[in-house]
Design a protein with these regions (language model features):
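Short basic/aromatic active-site micro-motif
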Residues: 207-226, 239
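N-terminal core-binding DNA-recognition domain of tyrosine recombinases/integrases
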Residues: 11-103
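Conserved tyrosine-mediated DNA breakage-rejoining catalytic core shared by Y-recombinases
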Residues: 133, 142-175
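Short alpha-helical segment immediately N-terminal to, or the first helix within
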Residues: 129-130, 143, 221-225, 235
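Active-site/catalytic core of tyrosine-dependent DNA strand-transfer enzymes
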Residues: 168-208, 212
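Basic, Lys/Arg- and aromatic-enriched nucleic-acid-binding interface segment
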Residues: 86, 98-101, 105-137, 141, ...
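Short, polar N-cap/turn motifs at the start of nucleic acid-interacting alpha helices
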Residues: 147-150, 208, 227-241
């Protein structure tokens, strides 16, 4: 059993992710779960499959969150094995988390119209990017003026993957062309956080409608217009794994 501390192991693992060019948002998520994971045992070397399963079962998480937490555990302990810190991974034989197929809940047009008319200027702009471009909160908050090349908007999505989106909305085009830096400046690496962006979006939408519902609205409208599921999926940044 190796007695290296959580701090030592987590620091080495996060450096490993950074060296591999993983997105800042991805590293932030991994750091969060590693912090939560520290309650499993005094050090990573004392974590067993049973303790790991008890930790996962002890949280009232949604399936997507549970899968994310388990994924971090898999990658973290695999790294410790590869680095010679552990002989075997306690996450090796965890059963995969079942995540039911998601059902789209597009925002009603009335909700979109009301938000665009009544929301503060900054939040209304966020609504436009979500409803008209299908951007996630984590993509909206990191937008910069130079992401627009005059024809296409380049968006860095999940896992640092870049996709291009055609823009026709004059308000969005003007906002990008008149912005030399971050479109939504803040305290997280110079821009707003995804969590705060999602909160702002939710604040101008009716109960039961979220910022992600605006993204679903975009997907629904785009599919109705094209009937091309692959093209819509590419614009929205859906990735097959």
């Amino acid at each position: 059993m190796n007695s290296k501390t959580w701090e030592n192991c987590a620091s080495a693992y996060l450096q490993h992710l950074k060296a591999a060019g993983r997105a800042k948002g991805t590293i932030r998520i991994h750091r969060y779960y590693l912090q939560v994971m520290r309650g499993i045992a005094p050090c990573p070397g004392l974590v067993s499959r049973e303790r790991l399963e008890a930790w996962l079962a002890g949280h009232d998480w949604k399936p997507e969150t549970r899968r994310s937490a388990q994924g971090v555990a898999h990658q973290f302990f695999k790294f410790l094995v590869e680095d010679g810190i552990l002989k075997d991974s306690p996450a090796k034989f965890l059963k995969p988390v079942h995540v039911p197929d998601g059902v789209p809940h597009p925002a009603p047009e009335s909700a979109v119209k009301n938000a665009l008319q009544n929301a503060p200027k900054r939040t209304a702009l966020m609504v436009r990017f979500a409803a008209l471009c299908g951007l996630r909160a984590c993509e909206i908050c990191t937008l910069q003026g130079n992401a627009w090349d005059g024809e296409l908007l380049r968006v860095k999505g999940k896992g640092g993957r870049v996709r291009v989106i055609p823009l026709q909305d004059s308000t969005l085009i003007y906002s990008l062309e008149s912005c030399p830096g971050w479109l939504f400046p803040g305290r997280i690496d110079g821009h707003l956080s995804a969590q705060y962006t999602a909160k702002l979006l939710g604040s101008v939408l009716p109960p039961g409608v979220t910022g992600h519902s605006l993204r679903h609205r975009f997907g629904t409208v785009a599919y109705r217009a094209t009937h091309d599921l692959l093209a819509v999926g590419a614009v929205m940044g859906h990735v097959k794994t």
